Each structure stands twice: as C-alpha cells, then as structure tokens.
C-alpha cells in the first residue's frame, strides 16, 4: 500500500512539491508502525553503536563476523543517501550546538524527553522521545489528575502549594464542573498550576531544527537496496541487533562452560559408518 502511495507522490511531485516527502507518523500499512521522522540519522546512530560494541566480542566469533559484515554493508548503503540541504543544515546545527550545548543536554527539550549523544563515529546525535499529545476525551475519568506534569497535584481533592485568595475562588469554580465537564476541569487545573508556579512548561529557549528529510524516492531506493522491508522495519531490526550485542557481551557465550559436558555425552547421537 505504502509503495503505491510513494509512486503516486513521486508522479505528482511537480504539482505538489510537498508530496515528495513522507509525513512522519502517517500509516505505513503495518499495524502499529508509523512513518519514521528521521530514519537516516536513526540508522547511522544504531549501526555505528552496534559496530562499536561488537569490538568487545572476540574476532574469531562467528556472530561478530556476520553481524559486522551485515551492519557495515547496510551502513554503507545508508551513508550514500544525503537529503537536499544537508550541508547547510549541518553548519547551522553545529553553530547552534556550540552556542547552546548546555540547553540541548537538558532532560526536557521543547516539552519532550531528549538528550544529546556523541556517537563513536564522531557525530553528535540529538535523540528526542516523541510523546504524542494526549486527548483527554479518550481517557476515562477516575477522579485523579492524569497529567504527568502535575507533580504537585496528587488527586482532585488535595492541592499542595501556596494558594492565593483569587486562586482559591478559581478552584471552587473548577470544583463545580468537576463531574459535569472533567476535561475543562483538568485543563483549568493545569492553567492554574502554571500560574501558581507548581506546573512548569518544560520548553527550552533553543529551537532545534531537525535534519532535512529524505525524499520518498530516496527512501524507496534505500529500501530496495537493503531488501528487508520498509525503512521503519529496518530501524526496528537495527534496534534489536544493538540490544542483542548488549546481551551477548553480558552473557559472554564465547567463554568456556562453567560445567563441562561429560565425556561421550553426545556419542549416542553421532552418525556412524
């Protein structure tokens, strides 16, 4: 389904230039798997970290040899595709990083969990955990405030903090609509919390510019060369491979067994002439 949509987007690119690019989060045709916002940088980060961690495994290990060969092959493919305007963006990002590095390493950035990581390849990766906005109409009201920003509000009954007289009046007004309109009730609590200083909008003064996206045609060509399904599936496989390397280095299966197998244990199963 998505491949057909890509072909259609490429064909109509002269009419709608924005159709040349895939919309992040849009359906891919696979349940639960949305379009990745920046698959190129994600794969570069995952592949380089995988290769770096594979160095902890002995060179004679067949797992290391096969994993390195596959990872290097796919990394070489990904590095060949560069989005339009990448060099100019890289220069802007470098200047922004030098000027606001302390802000970019904060736990919260633009309302999202984020961190700045330096990869083994020398690149700086800005990893952001995208949290979709929650629609309170889809949440069943159970009497508790479900907003994670409400660290000072435990339930709808008790409010911790200095409450001014006008704020007390506002709380009384909100309490009247608690059962009839829980959505407005919670939104009013949040607005009041921000005013009181108990709830802080976690937004950095720095506006980070994301990497220019690859075109739909570039992604389709990359998928064809890698040959492992959609690019989002390739990212998931790369994430699993990185986790597997961690498990292998912890288990150290290349070392001798703690309890050696008894001599002749497998003799019965040998194929004899």
Curated annotation (Swiss-Prot):
Accessory subunit of the mitochondrial membrane respiratory chain NADH dehydrogenase (Complex I), that is believed not to be involved in catalysis. Complex I functions in the transfer of electrons from NADH to the respiratory chain. The immediate electron acceptor for the enzyme is believed to be ubiquinone. The lineage of its organism: Eukaryota, Fungi, Dikarya, Ascomycota, Pezizomycotina. Belongs to the complex I NDUFA5 subunit family. Residues 1-8 form a transit peptide. InterPro entries: NDUFA5. It is a peripheral membrane protein. The keyword Cell division does not apply. The keyword Transit peptide applies. Complex I is composed of about 40 different subunits. GO terms for biological process: respiratory electron transport chain. This is NADH-ubiquinone oxidoreductase 29.9 kDa subunit, mitochondrial. GO terms for cellular component: mitochondrial inner membrane; respiratory chain complex I. Keywords: Electron transport, Membrane, Mitochondrion, Mitochondrion inner membrane, Respiratory chain, Transit peptide, Transport. Pfam families: ETC_C1_NDUFA5.
């Amino acid at each position: 389904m998505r491949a057909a949509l890509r072909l259609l987007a490429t064909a109509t690119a002269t009419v709608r230039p924005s159709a040349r690019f895939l919309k992040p989060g849009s359906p891919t045709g696979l349940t639960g798997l949305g379009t990745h916002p920046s698959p190129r940088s994600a794969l570069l980060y995952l592949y380089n970290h995988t290769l770096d961690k594979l160095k902890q495994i002995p060179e004679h290990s067949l797992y290391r040899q096969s994993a390195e060969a596959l990872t290097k092959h796919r990394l070489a493919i990904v590095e060949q595709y560069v989005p339009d305007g990448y060099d100019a963006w890289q220069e802007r990002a470098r200047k922004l990083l030098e000027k606001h590095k302390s802000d970019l390493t904060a736990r919260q950035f633009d309302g999202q969990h984020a961190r700045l990581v330096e990869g083994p390849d020398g690149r700086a990766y800005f990893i952001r955990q995208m949290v979709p906005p929650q629609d309170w109409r889809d949440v069943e009201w159970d009497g508790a405030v479900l907003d994670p920003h409400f660290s000072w509000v435990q339930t709808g009954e008790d409010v911790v903090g200095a409450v001014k007289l006008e704020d007390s009046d506002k709380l009384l007004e909100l309490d009247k609509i608690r059962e009839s309109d829980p959505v407005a009730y919670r939104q009013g609590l949040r607005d009041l919390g921000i005013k009181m200083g108990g709830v802080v909008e976690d937004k950095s003064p720095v506006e980070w510019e994301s990497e220019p996206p690859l075109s739909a045609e570039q992604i389709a060509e990359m998928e064809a060369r890698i040959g492992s399904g959609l690019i989002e599936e390739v990212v998931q496989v790369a994430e699993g491979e990185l986790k597997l390397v961690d498990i292998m280095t912890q288990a150290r299966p290349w070392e001798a067994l703690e309890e050696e197998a008894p001599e002749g244990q497998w003799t019965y199963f040998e194929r004899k002439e």
